[in-house]
Amino acid sequence: MGETVLLAAGGTGGHVFPGLATAAALHDARPDLEIAFVGTADRLEARLVPEAGWPLHTVPAMALRKDLSALKLPVVLGRAVSATRQLIRQSDVIAAVCFGGYTSVPLALAARTTGTPLVVHEQNAVPGRANKLASRAAAAVAVTFEQAADGFGSTRTVLTGNPVRPGLLPDAAPGEDLVAVRARLRDEALSTFGLRPDRRTLLVFGGSQGARQINRALTGAVGRWTRPEELQVLHATGSRTHDETVAAWEAVEHGGLHVVVEEFISRMDL
């Protein structure tokens, strides 16, 4: 295995997708680099990272909840750090990057104890708990919003913005203008999601895990819409609230409204 950059981006799309965008950019800049991810076997990264073509090494991890047992945390965290440290030593890891999520802390601690350079990327205006902990071992923290720098104390911060994966930017075929690109993507979206071409579409989403208040507000407002027969809804419920939202849609009178419910939409480029 050649020189490797190890990334931790897990739990939610807000962490995973910037990680995937960074992996693609690193590969474009240095095709000789090996890119690998650290993650958990039962979270979003377990599907998205392999789908993007990158290897995922799974380690034990758990949410950094405030009510977490003081007895459980050291045990599980210790196992995750040990597994990540072993991965670093088995590979020629020249740098590590944390994007937040459960596995960022184990990677940060493993990087610190092996002398591996570490960078943290924070996507939010208010830093998450995992990244704040990981930043203590980082050479620098890249932030999307300038105000996020206040949450990282004395650690050096750099305003970089949020990495955007190439798939969100439409690729035009030779000789294809923007109008043709939009028409092609529209046809693909109609086919992919089972939407109707003669209706206006409302897209509703609240992140990969879901936003219960958004979901409830949407299903609760359906009966008050005018001319619902002219509309359709593409609703991404999120993983945590999918079943209850499907049940809510089944319980309301649609009034001719065409509804497509998905747990997660990976083709946001459409």
Would you name each region that the model predicts?
Residues T4, D32-A36, P55, P117, ...:
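Residues at the starts of beta-strands that form the adenosine-phosphate
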Residues T4-G10, H27, D32-R79, A83, ...:
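Conserved nucleotide-sugar phosphate-binding/catalytic loop shared by glycosyltransferases and other
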Residues H15-D28:
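Short amphipathic alpha-helix
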Residues R30, L87-I94, L195-P197:
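Glycine-rich phosphate-binding loop signature in dinucleotide/nucleotide-binding domains
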Residues R43, L48, A52, P174-D177, ...:
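Donor-nucleotide binding loops and adjacent catalytic segments primarily
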Residues R43-R47, A95-T114:
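An aromatic- and histidine-rich active-site surface loop
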Residues P60-D92, V105-T113, R129-A137:
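Alpha-helical membrane-targeting segments
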Residues R112-L190:
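Active-site-proximal region of nucleotide-activated glycan assembly enzymes
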